[in-house]
């Protein structure tokens, strides 16, 4: 079983503190985080847990859909996947992720729009990151290029 590691060093309180998220397994870098920028409309060169969740979901989903297209006898071609992860106040208190909008556009060969949409929906529930996010509503828009 593969294990991937990320580590965060945080300093200060929630409203004024800052942190750095390090992608340990890949060594691809360290990224700055802060709560005020996390909650703002403009990220201002700062990442957030929500952006990282979006990256995890969009990459996992594209791999899963590519595999399903191949199993169905198609050729994946290019898939462009975007995950928009919402973050805001929770009516019950604190903050939450109320939902994720997943958009996929592709140009697979050997599939019609109906089959592509069916496989896109299947990938939404079968990719490992989607499974980990079962407590969050994920909507999907799938279209052919």
Regions picked out by a protein language model, each given a short descriptive name:
Residues 1-55, 59-145:
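Extended beta-strand/beta-hairpin segments
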């Amino acid at each position: 079983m593969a294990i991937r590691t990320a580590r965060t060093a945080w300093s200060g309180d929630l409203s004024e503190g800052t942190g750095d998220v390090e992608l340990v397994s890949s060594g691809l870098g360290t990224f700055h985080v802060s709560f005020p920028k996390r909650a703002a409309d403009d990220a201002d060169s700062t990442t957030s847990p929500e952006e990282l969740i979006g990256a995890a979901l969009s990459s996992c989903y594209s791999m899963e859909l590519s595999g399903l297209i191949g199993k169905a006898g198609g050729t994946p071609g290019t898939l462009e996947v975007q995950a928009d992860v919402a973050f805001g106040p929770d009516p019950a208190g604190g903050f939450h992720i109320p939902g994720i909008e997943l958009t996929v556009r592709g140009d697979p060969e050997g599939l019609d729009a109906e089959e592509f949409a069916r496989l896109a929906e299947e990938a939404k529930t079968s990719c490992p990151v989607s499974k980990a996010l079962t407590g969050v509503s994920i909507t999907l828009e799938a279209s052919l290029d």
